[in-house]
Amino acid sequence: MSKNSKAYRAAAEKVDRSNPYTPLQAAKLAKETSSTKQDATVEVAIRLGVDPRKADQMVRGTVNLPHGTGKTARVAVFAVGEKADAAVAAGADIVGSDDLIEKIQGGFLDFDAVIATPDQMAKVGRIARVLGPRGLMPNPKTGTVTPDVAKAVADIKGGKINFRVDKQANLHFVIGKASFEENKLAENYGAAIDEVLRLKPSASKGRYLKKITVSTTTGPGIPVDPSVTRNFTEA
């Protein structure tokens, strides 16, 4: 929805930007301000009090959302032999090695996550310039470089999300769909915030959660009170 459209302006008027909401209130308002016939994605944007240029202030992690994302992720796996068979059995959408690399080099990017066994990473490095900028490069810290590809596939299919602070100290992640009940959105939000807080760098000084906004892909940003770090489903 265009920010200049009548529907967007009407939705934005429902948001009191001077008064941050609780997570549950924000989830309810996000549902109300999503004016699209499609089931819009609900997203969270956080401004962190870190300097991502410094290695000791990088925030990167994963979390299993208790209610999933509302979308079944397409997963690509780099593996061979028994590991490849295990990935297929777990529901991976595409599995390969050199053949998959060639396909990606040719422009194939029809997947949302990439997993690799450790022995495949030297090969996967050949397409790092393709996967890296899209946030798809497998990494041990996010559990996507692992010998247990079956578990990794199951986790991602079940609603595991990855997040990483960008150069402007912002984090972005999905917490569900507008069709979710607000309680479920708030619980997903809480699970993600708990993990972000757990990963707070010791070198980060001052306020860590500086600004939080919840929105749908088609709706206005809704400010959330950063001080609410417990009891996420209370109004």
Swiss-Prot record:
GO terms for molecular function: rRNA binding; structural constituent of ribosome; tRNA binding. Keywords: Repressor, Ribonucleoprotein, Ribosomal protein, RNA-binding, rRNA-binding, Translation regulation, tRNA-binding. GO terms for biological process: regulation of translation; translation. Residues 1-22 are annotated as: Disordered. GO terms for cellular component: large ribosomal subunit. SUPFAM superfamilies: Ribosomal protein L1 (SSF56808). It comes from the Bacteria. Disulfide bonds: none annotated. InterPro entries: Ribosom_uL1_bac-type, Ribosomal_uL1, Ribosomal_uL1-like, Ribosomal_uL1/biogenesis, Ribosomal_uL1_3-a/b-sand, Ribosomal_uL1_CS. The keyword Membrane does not apply. It holds the Pfam family Ribosomal_L1. HAMAP family: Ribosomal_uL1_B (MF_01318_B). Binds directly to 23S rRNA. The L1 stalk is quite mobile in the ribosome, and is involved in E site tRNA release. Belongs to the universal ribosomal protein uL1 family. Part of the 50S ribosomal subunit. This is Large ribosomal subunit protein uL1. The lineage of its organism: Bacteria, Bacillati, Actinomycetota, Actinomycetes, Mycobacteriales.
